[in-house]
Amino acid sequence: MPAPGTQFIWDDQSQINPIDNTIKVTIDRPINFSAFSSDKGPEEFTKIENAQAFADYYGDNIDFARHGQSLLTAASFVKAGGRLFARRVVAEDAKLANIAVIANVTKTNIQKTDENGKALYRDNATGEETTSSVASTPIMTQVADLEFTLQSVDMVSNNPGDYKTALKASHTHNGLGKDGSYPLFLFTDIGRGVSNKRIRIYRNNTTKYPIVYASYILKVMEENQDGTLSELETFMFSLNPDIRDSGLNMSLTRVVNAKTSRQIRTRIFEEYWDEFYKNLAYISGRDEKEMALCDLLYNTDLYGKKMSNIRVKSTSVNLNNLNGISLLNGSNGRFGTNPMANLEYYYKQIQMVFNGSCEQGDSIYDVDNNRIDVIFDCNYPAAIKRSIEELVAFREDCEYFEDMGTKGLMSFQDIKYQVSKLPESARSKFVMLYSNYWDILDPYSGKQITVTSTYNMAVKFVNHYLNGVSRPFCGQAYGIVFDDVIDGTINFTPKHTPKSGDQKQFFDDNRINYATYYDGVLTMDSEFTAQRAYTQLSWGNNVLMVQALIREIRQRCPINRYKFLDGDDLVQYKQDVESIIARHSSKFETIQVIYTKDLNYDMNKIFYARIQVTFRNFIQTEIFKIEAIRNSENAVL
């Protein structure tokens, strides 16, 4: 019995008859799967919806020299309006920046004082309190000395839980009435590496006294390159993890989490909190339940008054420091400040993303939950290219725009040799091969840099997709021209000369895409997929159209799954599929769905249908026959 799922079978029956050689013939926003290094950001697979989210997570310091074409492509893709399914890579020995706040409670016996601060004694004769020390005994009282300190853990892990465990092991608490050291909460960066982030915590003064519970404002800040501070995020929370306000829990871990913060992660030590406030209440002689609601960070009660029998030490850390408290012990590990300087190791980490061997790497194969439309090569070495080819062959719902690198390829012979070495895994309808590289001005630094043509294609793809992926992804008619390429830097453009012959025909025959000049305008001249067979799926726009159709049907099918294969349920199932087909009908010359009624399929709980499409043809080559005819005066009657 088959497992639940939606399967698609590619049956290519669109073989194109070759033309006689004597005749010269030559919508939602897309999601790009990207892997890159960056100065900061999460290490998990992350779905990026827009350029602001990208900047929040990974920063806007897009340094090509240190992070290469992969980061630049990802940033430019979202800036153009696209979306990302992204994974930031770090060195395996990188460390997570973190800081924890520790509450230290010490029981101390001191002489009792009156409201004016004068020492009190007990008269030996009358037993009454007095400020006179003559014939009297000092009255001693028990107070709790409170000191907040900071602690950071130095270890190789991206899991805040590991840091929490390490902190718990380093602190002791001996029960009520005893001295104790209590970790209260932990802050970490959202991913490993050197961190410039800081946190600041101060009392929430927006509520009137008496308050129901003490709440605090958490500000997340970051130091800029010029030394100034930027405020990134602000949250309100309670130390007490049991507080609910308007139906919402106000604990730090509920308020600051993966859905609410793009900057930090938090952990609280709930069991230590309980022991902390109960011991503080016991030593100071205050009501335990009220103590849990008071402002313990700044030692005030529900009326805003300083709590007696609790003293905050002058050595206690100032959590309200305007410059914030730094996250410490972050490290880039082997990447250092320049991952591209350790290129072999950098590419090892990139490949682990694309071959699924990284942590949670099987996410890349989840076609139901993790949509991918395109993958743009970023001058990757051969091993990474092979991994991406295998990925798109497995998924079948996304297209790989593969470059041929930036080494050599300066002559026709160079390219012919490179083409001869292409493996069969590259010869797929899910791969489009591009032969060009050139120089552009880095949009972030203004410096001249070398990129493969897939960078420019990535930037162009977003608008092209939005305006109709059914259109050919090449040519001046659809704006696939490159006015940002610096003159004289393109590696090679094919020509047709008496000496060289028709080089373009070689590119077409081998399904290699190239750019060339038309009246000074650098234009992407083809959009072949790399499959060897010459069919309608040899054209990239046709494959992209079918993939878009597949994704929409796949998204719809789970809504109807487990409904019955008869009656109204079957009618509704068919109507849902047909409504999707209707929305895509203008993109194809013809499209129809044919339902197959088969008892064996029914018994195995399978809904089977065939979707037949014919594709719209477009003009790639123009043939004009020039006929010279006699004028009427010379015509023979």
Protein language model features and the residues they cover:
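Long, contiguous regulatory modules within eukaryotic nuclear regulatory proteins
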Residues: D162-D189, V194-N196, L218
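A short beta-strand signature
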Residues: Y216-M221, I611
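Long, low-complexity, polar/charged, intrinsically disordered or flexibly structured peripheral segments
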Residues: Y272-C358
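E2/UBC-UEV (E2-variant) core
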Residues: F237-F269
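Broad, structure-driven detector of short, well-ordered beta-strand segments within folded domains
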Residues: A169, V194-K208, F235
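Structured, hydrophobic secondary-structure cores that serve as assembly/anchoring elements
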Residues: M1-D114, L120-D123, E129, V134-D162, ...
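A short, compositionally biased
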Residues: T206-I217, F607
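Surface-exposed loop/edge segments in extracytoplasmic proteins
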Residues: G227-E233
